[in-house]
């Protein structure tokens, strides 16, 4: 092992720059095993997608079933809304509303039908098409897999604590010789890079697998470029690469079973796991953690059921066939101005589409346990990450028509675009509806106060309108909250599983509170996503900031700066509707979320309150009630920082000094 002590000895430490850190980085790395990764000519492809190995013979039937169910539910919701709006005729603005409602109901229907299918599958005895069985004996591997941990200005101690836990877990399976671990750093901050190298020095001394550290001088291509650089330098030495994020955690058993599945299915290009969220401490993080654990698997299982060999990639916690990736996933600079041109921002969905175009199958592993990640701790960090993903998905719009893509790959790209485009559609739909309602002749004649409405209630009631409105509300409720309720029913149907959620009462209470909070947060996200799309299309694309993974408080100043415009908008709308009670009543759930944007942001980021909820069993998950061994092992010191080192400004900082994130 290379001697690195001079970097950290107090007597020889000096103020350093990132270039100096890179030049002085003498960590041993393996001999390069180059693998060509040519840039793909995205617009030049002869014919359609190459044929891939299908593991399920009735996939076309499944997709027809899903399509018919989605259309039926979407039409039912749209027809109920039409019956409500069309009483007395349809104005031009109401026609706009009805037009915008169509894609909204179809998207909700797809979400509901996918979850319903997943629920039905999970209520039976499902078998993994890939043959991944957690009850089977541990397989013996015959290939080598590289575990890639890309980092960018992260908390080095936390990253290496997770790596140490994964390394130990792999060793327990007896397969340490089949896995090498690479920390591939794109860190731009010299002091963070020094911290990474200090942690690596200890990790390498203790590791069971071969472990390596590489820092790039230029972070060309961001994460996709980071992985591509590794592939081009060392890819031919490894049959597979298991791609992680800095907050990823996977058991050794899960990694071994993924590698075994790749060995048994040589036509598989990628297998994506479903990471469960762990370590949530704030109210916001714990709510996401609870919701994902409770009902995420019904949607995930349904998605796996109808996507088959044409699934998608989430960018992490997935295993990839290295040769297939190198052959098909060299990403070019996209032509044209931003936001559509330049570096590919959201690479994962495009990479899975290119893999499938090249004849490699892309799968989900819906029944594999042992895959984890963490979530943003507050709504501000969630919105920041969401904006970055939004830009990446908008960039996919012209890529949907790329020649040679499988139609399912195009559908995944469309779903990604719609996940953000639905927010402005909802916004414009609501705006058109409110303007239309405000201009109705009945409201022009008189503005009813609450007392006037109560006194004249009997005369104003139109039972046909109430019936139509009730049906529209019921169908919308089922489409929105049905998957969550199905997830709870699944837990209740499985003996002993409800204990992991704190018991029936606590699970029901958590479900109710989560549904309320999600209903309040939805209008806020509608505003933030709509604004993000407008700014991105206007050319304000933003940079690549490091993620804050441990923020446990948002003060009023920060919350107001980010969300104050939403609260003000809600207050203005509420004041405008005060003398039109029907509008105020109809929009109350949306207005509540807007008005409370600032306090909800502050409350959601509260760590102490989140831990109190945990102590009382609210939002409990099985991984919290009985933490898996790897989750327990990933908590704790993973490195011994030097007594002091120096930042760029020459001031010494110690191990307890907070590391500054680079913008």
Swiss-Prot record:
InterPro entries: Glucans_biosynth_gluTrFase_H, Glyco_trans_2-like, Glycosyltr_2/OpgH_subfam, Nucleotide-diphossugar_trans
Taxonomy, superkingdom: Bacteria
BP GO annotations: glucan biosynthetic process
Enzyme class: transferase
Pfam families: Glyco_trans_2_3
Alphabetical keyword list: Cell inner membrane, Cell membrane, Glycosyltransferase, Membrane, Transferase, Transmembrane, Transmembrane helix
A Gene Ontology cellular-component term: plasma membrane
A GO molecular function held by the record: hexosyltransferase activity
Subcellular location: Cell inner membrane
Enzyme nomenclature, EC number: 2.4.1.-
Membrane topology designation: Multi-pass membrane protein
Parts of the chain that traverse the membrane: 65-85, 104-124, 415-435, 472-492, 507-527, 559-579, 583-603
Chief place of localization: membrane
Biological or metabolic pathway of the protein: Glycan metabolism; osmoregulated periplasmic glucan (OPG) biosynthesis
Role of this protein: Involved in the biosynthesis of osmoregulated periplasmic glucans (OPGs).
Similarity section: Belongs to the glycosyltransferase 2 family. OpgH subfamily.
Protein name (database record): Glucans biosynthesis glucosyltransferase H
Organism: Caulobacter vibrioides (strain NA1000 / CB15N)
